[in-house]
Amino acid sequence: MSVKSTRARRVSSDTELTESFEHNWMFDFKIKRPFYFNPKHREFYDCIKHSKTKMGFVDGPAGSMKTYIAVYAGLELIKQEKFQRLVYIRSVTESAERSLGSLPGEVDDKFSPYAIPLQEKITEITNGGTYTMLKQKGVVEAIPVNFVRGLTFNKALVIVDEAQNLSRKELTTILTRFGRDSRYIVLGD
């Protein structure tokens, strides 16, 4: 890992020193260069990165790199400290005709299978172990749509994945959680 250089400044307490140190290490991860962006990919990427973008809606066929590009741009924006966290929201709709039934465990355990696309993309874009580190530090959050009500996403890049599986009421609930200095990217097939 490389150490991020910062300007020297006076620190008034041990707490402030600890917070400053943790902040500098929080964004210290490497992002690999993308393998190929065609013109449509580049247009989507540029839209996410543009400072005036507050909300973007993207639809495209399965496998067209929508989630990959959104996560890639999101990690870059976090590394540049434009946002403090990346929030991944997804419906818990299963794609099979038959349900697996209730899963055992806590909410994180139950939702973790639905967060696999986020985990895979972060692992592919960065080095191994980055997803776990970012999740533990609260920089990356995966939230089921069922738990969005009452939250406000400040200083966050919010990726709403598989939006075609959301009801109008669920989408409205998600989009009304918009907070200060946030950006929404809604992806669907």
Residue ranges and their predicted role:
Residues 1-23:
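Interdomain "pre-motor" coupling segment immediately N-terminal to P-loop NTPase/helicase cores
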Residues 22-33:
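Conserved adenine-nucleotide phosphate-binding loops and their immediately adjacent elements
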Residues 33-52:
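N-terminal pre-P-loop "Q-motif" helix
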Residues 51-56, 155:
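Pre-Walker A (Motif I) flank of P-loop NTPase domains
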Residues 56-137:
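Conserved P-loop
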Residues 119-127, 172-185:
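Conserved catalytic/switch belt of AAA+ P-loop NTPases
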Residues 136-173:
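Conserved RecA-like ASCE ATPase "motif II neighborhood" in helicase/translocase motors
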Residues 159-161, 183-189:
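Structural recognition of the conserved hydrophobic beta-strand(s) that form the central parallel beta-sheet
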